[in-house]
UniProtKB/Swiss-Prot annotation:
HAMAP family in alphabetical order: Ribosomal_bL35 (MF_00514)
SUPFAM superfamilies: L35p-like
Entry GO terms, CC: cytosolic large ribosomal subunit
GO biological process: translation
Gene name, Swiss-Prot/TrEMBL: rpmI
InterPro entries for the chain: Ribosomal_bL35, Ribosomal_bL35-like, Ribosomal_bL35_CS, Ribosomal_bL35_sf
Keyword set, alphabetical order: Ribonucleoprotein, Ribosomal protein
Protein's name according to its UniProt entry: Large ribosomal subunit protein bL35
Organism: Blochmanniella pennsylvanica (strain BPEN)
Listed GO MF terms: structural constituent of ribosome
Family per similarity comment: Belongs to the bacterial ribosomal protein bL35 family.
Amino acid sequence: MPKIKTLQAASKRFKITALGKYKYKHANMRHILTKKSTKHKRHLRQKSILPKIYLTTIMKYLPYI
C-alpha cells in the first residue's frame, strides 16, 4: 500500500505544539489595515490553537507530523 501524501498547504500553515495541539496564524493582516482597530490588529497578531472540531480533518492532511 502506498504512503499517504502530506498536504503541503496544510503543513505550511499549521505547527504542532508539545502537547499535540495545532497552532496557526490568523488571517486578515496583509492589507486594508487602516479601518481595523489597534486592539483588533493586536489580537490578529497572536497565534491561535485549532478548535477540536477541525482536528480530524487536519490529522488527515498531516499524517506524519
